[in-house]
C-alpha cells in the first residue's frame, strides 16, 4: 500500500509539462485515452464565466503548433517563460499554455513574438 501512496504523491506533484508527457506516454505505449472528465472540468469554468460578460483582462497564451522553425519558437518560449532548454523544447513539441493570466498587452506581445518565430498561437 505504501507504494501506491508514493505513486499518488508523485502524480499529484507533477508539473503541467510532466503531466502532458505522462498523458502522451500512457496514450502511445499503453493505448490509454484521457478520460472524458477532463473535458468537463475544462468546460465548467468557461460556462460560469460567460454570464459575467465583462471584458477579459487576463489571457492564457496557448501554443497550438510550433510550425516548421521549432528552434526559433523554442528560443522565444525560453525568453518568455525562463524555462531551461529541455523544458522549453518539451513544451513546444507538446503544445499547451506558454503563459497563464497575462495582461492583454503582454499576451498580445507574446503572441506576436511567437508568431514571428513561426508558431501558431491562441489567446484564451
Swiss-Prot record:
It comes from Cereibacter sphaeroides (strain ATCC 17025 / ATH 2.4.3). One of its GO terms (biological process) is translation. The keyword Transit peptide does not apply. PANTHER family: 39S RIBOSOMAL PROTEIN L12 (PTHR45987), LARGE RIBOSOMAL SUBUNIT PROTEIN BL12M (PTHR45987:SF4). The lineage of its organism: Bacteria, Pseudomonadati, Pseudomonadota, Alphaproteobacteria, Rhodobacterales. It comes from the Bacteria. GO terms for cellular component: cytosolic large ribosomal subunit. This is Large ribosomal subunit protein bL12. The gene is rplL. Keywords: Ribonucleoprotein, Ribosomal protein. NCBIfam families: L12 (TIGR00855). Belongs to the bacterial ribosomal protein bL12 family. The keyword Membrane does not apply. Pfam families: Ribosomal_L12, Ribosomal_L12_N. InterPro entries: Ribosomal_bL12 (IPR000206), Ribosomal_bL12_C (IPR013823), Ribosomal_bL12_C/ClpS-like (IPR014719), Ribosomal_bL12_oligo (IPR008932), Ribosomal_bL12_oligo_N_sf (IPR036235). GO terms for molecular function: mRNA binding; structural constituent of ribosome. Homodimer. Part of the ribosomal stalk of the 50S ribosomal subunit. Forms a multimeric L10(L12)X complex, where L10 forms an elongated spine to which 2 to 4 L12 dimers bind in a sequential fashion. Binds GTP-bound translation factors. Forms part of the ribosomal stalk which helps the ribosome interact with GTP-bound translation factors. Is thus essential for accurate translation.
Amino acid at each position: 500500500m505504501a507504494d501506491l501512496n508514493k505513486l499518488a504523491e508523485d502524480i499529484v506533484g507533477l508539473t503541467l509539462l510532466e503531466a502532458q508527457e505522462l498523458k502522451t506516454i500512457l496514450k502511445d505505449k499503453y493505448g490509454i485515452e484521457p478520460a472524458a472528465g477532463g473535458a468537463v472540468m475544462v468546460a465548467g469554468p468557461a460556462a460560469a464565466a460567460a454570464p459575467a460578460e465583462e471584458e477579459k483582462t487576463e489571457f492564457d497564451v496557448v501554443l497550438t503548433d510550433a510550425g516548421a522553425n521549432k528552434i526559433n519558437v523554442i528560443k522565444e518560449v525560453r525568453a518568455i517563460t525562463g524555462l531551461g532548454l529541455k523544458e522549453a523544447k518539451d513544451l513546444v513539441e507538446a503544445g499547451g499554455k506558454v503563459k497563464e493570466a497575462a495582461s492583454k498587452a503582454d499576451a498580445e506581445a507574446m503572441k506576436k513574438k511567437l508568431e514571428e518565430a513561426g508558431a501558431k498561437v491562441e489567446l484564451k
